[in-house]
Structure formats: structure tokens, C-alpha cells
Amino acid sequence: MKKRYLALAVGVLSLTSACQDFLDVNENPNAPQTVTANLYLPPMIHWMVTSPAFDGRFVSRYTQQLTLPGTVLSTWDRMGYDPSSDNGAQMWRDYYWSFGQNLVDMMNKAEAEERWDLLGVGQILKAWGWQQLTDLHGEIIVKEAIDQTKFTFNYDSQEYAYQEVQRLLNEAIKNLQRTDGAVDQAYLARGDKMYNGDRTKWIKFAYGMLALNLNHYSNKSTYKPAEVIAAVDKSFSSNADDALLTYPNTNNDDINFLGRTRGNFQNYRQTQFVVGLMNGTAFGGVVDPRLSRMLSPSPDGQYRGLDPDVVGFGALTAQQQPNNPYGYAGTGGLQLPGRYLFDDKAKLPAMTYSQLQFVKAEAAYRAGDKATALAAYRNAVSSHIDFVNARNLDNNQNATQITAAEKAAFLASPAIVPTDPGQLTLTQIMSQKYIAQWMWGHNELWMDMRRYNYTGVDPVTGQPIYPGFEPPTNLYPDNGGKVVHRIRPRYNSEYVWNRAGLDAIGGLALDYHTKPLWITQP
């Protein structure tokens, strides 16, 4: 009998051991089960820059940066959307999922370990996510986000989202200014692929974000241009501060999303509108030297763009049809140098000095300080020319450098940069800002166009803010004749699983994407 009990005991112990071994199958003996706080950072910085490029395939068509010619007019070129699709919602996915609990864990660890610099960067990333999402989608989920006890979520107002961005940025600045605790440049640098652990540059980045946020209030009585200018002055001081992500180009996931090898834009073409801003049509016949360094010529060597209202290439011959952004007619040129940002190794920005100087110029102009506005505007245009040259050297692309003589002649043209501050116009500021943000600053560019209702006019000159821009005449049927103002929330998380939350904000309406944003209203 004792032998039976002994055998049973041995059997139970063996079963327990086997069960434990089975439960251990998800433990990798060759990899850590937990990671240090700084190792959460690299993929989030990657998506911070790359996600807007994903959604840029769609935002760029609302704003007529690019068009997608085909045998019928494209949905997004008509300011519509793709039903039952996640198109246009990469940022939504990446902020709530790729950042999601990872960002929560990183910030909790950083705070517990008194790594105030890493905590500050985390707060910037959190603010960045809210800013990008609310500018794309309007009302978003903030208070209940990443709550693992919930299965459905309530939306928050855009006003609240904007206030939360400001709060997070102010907290981030305070934390990044701290030198106590376990603040450590080398530790932060291990995961910081943007600024290599430089707290000073992250502080400047936070002020830049604050400037962008505050400037979006331009249509409201609470708009304070002096606060916008003050934030810009504490942000980037030159192109050396630009927030750039370098792509190693070792495999598909770390190749620039706009790059030739990934081929995401081989069927896209530049529009008549953007060509018109640069070929002399919009600005007194002055040809922009950036035209031949940013845009693609047709096979006959001329620069043309397509009209989103015209099916395909219209009446253009094969020699007249503009090449794709890589500089090729179709799929040719794989792994060959591209053009400007459309190259495998081209660095993509999250924010630039030029962009922020345009923000300062607009704020100063609105405040009536035309001298400050002109100085900032000139800095903005000049620094973007330098930016174009730098990006075309990232991988020795096939565009020549803009010479000092070309740059000087362009900046000396009164149609581009007036000598008299009183002659500066909003048309110049906003159109040149459009060029400077072309194909990377999608969300800010679209916010600008919505703030000016796409076809708004300069109150001083009566001229269009964006000369040559016309909304499509054949708008998407669900629009009801209205232009687009937001992208619908992500289909597979919201329209499938969170319909009650959407219903509360009117998100189930077929024309929800045409509802103006709170921030653009008086």
C-alpha cells in the first residue's frame, strides 16, 4: 500500500513538473522577459514619424499634394473615404496599440526610477499622439484610453484633447529641466533615435509642439499670437534642431515609407496645384528653384501636375504624363536613388525649424507686427531651401543641389520675399508653408487648409490664401456637397466594436467626415 502512495506521489510530482514545463513554453531563455524603460522608446519614435507617412497617402489627396490617377476618379481625391476599411487610420492604430500600454509601462517605470528625462520624453510622445489624432479625427478617446477593464469607450471633446496636450507638454518641459534623480543622457540615448538623449533638444521640441497647438486657435477669440511667438522663440533655433528620423535601410520595416524600394507611391502623381505654386503661376512668374529638386518632371523634361477632377492622365501623351514622385514612369528604378523625401534613406522629419518659423510669421502677421512676420517668413523660406538640399544628400539622390546664386535670386524676388513688411501677405506665408510641409507635414498642412476653409481669402488683398486650389467638383456622394474636415475613426476598432461611443458623437452619420472641427470654428 505504501508503494502505491509513493508511486502516486511521484506521479503527482511528475505531472506538476510537466505542467510547469508546459507553462514555461512562452518564456524565451534567450531574451529578457521584461525590458528596461529606455528600450520601449525606439519603436514609438519610429511610429511617431512613420505613421503620418502611412496616413499621408490619404491626407495628401485631400490637400492635393498628390493624386492617384486611375480609370475612375479616386475616393480620396473626391474628399471621401473607404467604407469598411482602416485606410486613413494608421495613426489611430499606432497610438492606441503600438504606443498604448507600452507607453504607459515606460512612463510608469521612468517615474518609479526617477528618470525624469525619459518621463518627459514619454509625456511628449503622449501629447504628440493626442495632437495628431484629434487633428485628424476630431473627437477622440482620451480619459478612458488604455483602460484594460473596458470594452467600449466614450469619446472626449476636441477642446479637452487640446487642453490635455498643453498640460502634458508643460509637465514634460518641467521634467526635462530636472537634473536630480536618475537623469542620465547615456541611458536615454540608448533608446532615443531622434536626439540621442539631448534633453535640450527635446525641450525645444516640446515648445515647438506647444506653438503648433496654440496657433490652431487662430479662428477663436481666445487666440493669443504673443504666446505662439514666445513658444516658437523657445523652440528650434536652426535646421540643426530639426527632428529627423534616420532609416537604416537594412530591411523593409526600417526603410523610409516613402522610399523607392517599398514602392508605396509608384502610382501617385503630383497635382496641378502644387506645380502651380512653384512654376511661377501663383507668384508673378518666379520659378522656384525647389521645383526641380522636389517634384518630378515628365519624360519630356517639363513639370506638369494632374487635376484630381480629371480621370487618369486626361489628354496628356505618354511623354507629357508626369512621372511618379520617385522620378520614374512606373515600377522602374527599384533600389535606385529617388528624389527628395522619396528615397529609401531620406530622413523624415517630425518637425522642422522652417515649419516653426512659418508659424511665427503667421502669428506675428495676425498680431499686426509685420516686421517680425517678414523676418520669420524669410528665415522659413531660406531654411527650407537648405532643408531640400540636405535631404537630397541623405542618399546622394539624383537631384542637383540648389546653388547659392539660385537661392539668393529667389529670396531677392519681391513676389516671394517683399522688402517692405507692409507688402507681406498671408497668401505668401501659407502657400510657402504648404511647400515646406509638402509630403511630410500632412496633419499640420491639412490643419492650415481647414483653418482657412480651403478657399479662404487674404482679408487685406482679397486674394486666395492658396492660389489655384479648388475642391473637387465631383465630391464623394456621402459628402452631400460638403468638403472634408476629418477622417472617420478607425473602422475595425470603432465601427465594429464601439458603435455606441460613435453614436454619441454623431460618428455613424454617412457625412460625419464633413463635420467641421471644434478648433477651426470661431
Task: Give the location of each predicted region.
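Bacterial N-terminal signal peptides that target proteins for export
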Residues: M1-L6
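Hydrophobic helical h-region of N-terminal Sec-dependent signal peptides
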Residues: A9-G11
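Bacterial Sec-type N-terminal signal peptides, specifically the leucine/valine-rich hydrophobic h-region
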Residues: L15-T16
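Membrane-proximal, proline-rich intrinsically disordered regions
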Residues: C19-T75, M79-D82, G333-G338, N453-P522
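Structured, solvent-exposed acidic/aromatic patches
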Residues: V35-N38, P69-N392, T419-L426, Q432
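Surface-exposed intrinsically disordered loops and tails
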Residues: Q185-L188, V310-P325, L393-D420, G462-D478
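C-terminal/domain-terminus segments
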Residues: I229-K234, A240-T246, L445-P467
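Active-site/pore-lining binding-face segments in mid-to-C-terminal subdomains
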Residues: R378-Q463
